[in-house]
Amino acid sequence: MEQLIAAILTMVAGVLVCAAYFWSTNLVLDWIFPSKGKFGAVASRNLRIANSIRPWLFLAPALLALTLYLVYPVVQSVWLSLHGRGGQNFVGLSNYSWMINDGEFRQSIFNNFLWLLVVPALSTFFGLIIAALTDRIWWGNIAKTLIFMPMAISFVGAAVIWKFIYDYRAAGSEQIGLLNAIVVALGGEPQAWITLPFWNNFFLMVILIWIQTGFAMVILSAALRGIPEETIEAAVIDGANGWQIFFKIMVPQIWGTIAVVWTTITILVLKVFDIVLAMTNGQWQSQVLANLMFDWMFRGGGDFGRGAAIAVVIMILVVPIMIWNIRNATRESGGH
């Protein structure tokens, strides 16, 4: 109860502070550049200057927060990446040289690119197919709700659920893991799925695909509904079958939205951390960049320089895709 009251008071205080800020800054601006009581060129000049400054007064808190929580951490991370374990001794590019020669880093890069090849493609594909199918059945909204539900679960929560599905017990013991129970029922031998090198990456990917398919489905369903009916009717009149209508008429018209969904999931994949941490903690050759960074910075490594260098690599991989995604989304919204 105390936490709820504290949260409410914090929200009220925040609103009051914002209101006081906007009121006082506008008051000061009108005092410095008054237009009331002024005439002619002076009034026009003051009004023009005040109107040009006023938007920046509204943007100032957001710009301050952006600088404090985004720009400063980026600069600090780059600076730390050029220093040693304690962040004190300048070592230049030694941390980046270490990364190139480190086997675990190379394994993490390989795993991340493996995730990039599989997760965005399958999440977008399943989302598109499900969106197209559920729009044609009367219980489609119920199906969409069920498929979207994993989006409401945290990555750690989803990992715990799937950890039970992949659970392994020795042969002869009762299998509580759903997957091994099915394998044993079919006459097979139980497997420790998440400890199988290379293949365990795919078992972890299933979790993120399970979550992100709902996201892709919702966005692509809205895009499909925005396709003009006239184009589909014209294709039917011309004798096109269902496959031709879908792949040659519908998909090309929503290609921009598909690209936005794909790249959004790609950005998420490059930063994947929670699932790997909760399922394997990077063991059995399942390490990824974000978890490796966490290990070096906050665990046994305790090396802020190397951890920051890995963070910079993640940023370099994410930023170009993020910029392209924003531009493409802006172009799509402008087109509609």
UniProtKB/Swiss-Prot annotation:
In the record, which residues are listed under signal peptide? none
- Record InterPro entries: ABC_transporter_permease (IPR051393), MetI-like (IPR000515), MetI-like_sf (IPR035906)
Major place of localization? membrane
The UniProt record lists the keyword Transmembrane helix: yes
GO BP terms in the entry: transmembrane transport
Keyword tRNA-binding in annotation: no
Give its localization.
Answer: Cell inner membrane
Q: Which UniProt keywords apply?
A: Cell inner membrane, Cell membrane, Membrane, Sugar transport, Transmembrane, Transmembrane helix, Transport
**Topology relative to the membrane:** Multi-pass membrane protein
Which SUPFAM superfamilies does the UniProt record give? MalF N-terminal region-like, MetI-like
Q: Which residues cross the membrane?
A: 4-24, 55-75, 113-133, 146-166, 176-196, 202-222, 258-278, 304-324
Residue ranges occupied by any ABC transmembrane type-1 domain in the UniProt entry: 109-325
Question: CDD domains in the record, alphabetically?
Answer: TM_PBP2
One GO CC annotation, please? plasma membrane
Family of this protein = Belongs to the binding-protein-dependent transport system permease family. MalFG subfamily.
Protein purpose: Part of the binding-protein-dependent transport system for alpha-glucosides such as sucrose, maltose and trehalose. Probably responsible for the translocation of the substrate across the membrane.
Specify the protein name: Alpha-glucoside transport system permease protein AglF
